[in-house]
Amino acid sequence: MPTDHTRTAILSAAERLYADRGFADVTLRDIVAAADVNLAAVNYHFGSKDELIAELFVTRSMATNRQRLNELKAAELAGGGRAAIDAIFRALVGPTLRGCLGPDNERSAAARFMIRASIESVPPIRRIKNREIDHLRKFAAAMRRSLPGRDQVELYWGLHFALAMAHQTIRDSERLIKLSEGSCDLNDVAGILDRIVSVSVMALTGGEAEKMPPAKLAARDAR
């Protein structure tokens, strides 16, 4: 098998196995068997299981981040250089939600791998998430342009909470379905996106809670 085909076969088999069984339960020997290659080929191309996981995650994350930045660029062009805050949040979380949610039969191995990466915290993925933040800096800058009078710290929290809502929805989708007895439709990705964007915008732009210090909020809620 040519070298590039061997590499592709390993990546494809690993992605499928990790998506289906999780990171801890899949061994390099499982991947070797599924890819129909020898262990030396995995060691030659990737060096270790962690490096293999890292390459898969980087490849898929780069595709998502490109889509995010393309949507952000379009929103800023539409706004004459200053995107509306709702359009910024939509570009931030939309690609992830559309890639990971929806009917099961529409989910590719790539999408299921990214869902697994969101559910399971493993060292190579944590390291990449903590290191690769340049695209998020661009979103933070867009938020500052959109809301120039807003405290920068609040904008960072707003960005963080929007991402947290999206990832929590992906991680615990089955629990939400059970809790709501099926009334919350996780196949309605557009509706989920609208809800996350709406809450994110509200947190930054509206209401008494935005202006009141945390200590005063606690005192008020205790009454």
Residue ranges, per PLM feature:
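Helix-turn-helix
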Residues: A9, L17, R21-T59
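Hydrophobic/aromatic residues within well-ordered alpha-helical segments
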Residues: K49, L56, R60, T64, ...
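Conserved phosphoryl-transfer catalytic core
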Residues: E51, R60-A75
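Hydrophobic alpha-helical connector segments
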Residues: L69-S108
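C-terminal peripheral helix-coil segments that are non-catalytic and often amphipathic
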Residues: A87, R98, G102, I133-R223
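Amphipathic alpha-helical segments used for helix-helix packing
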Residues: A87-A91, G102-I133, S173-K178
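Short alpha-helical scaffolding segments that buttress acidic/His motifs in well-ordered protein cores
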Residues: L92, T96, A111-S118, A162, ...
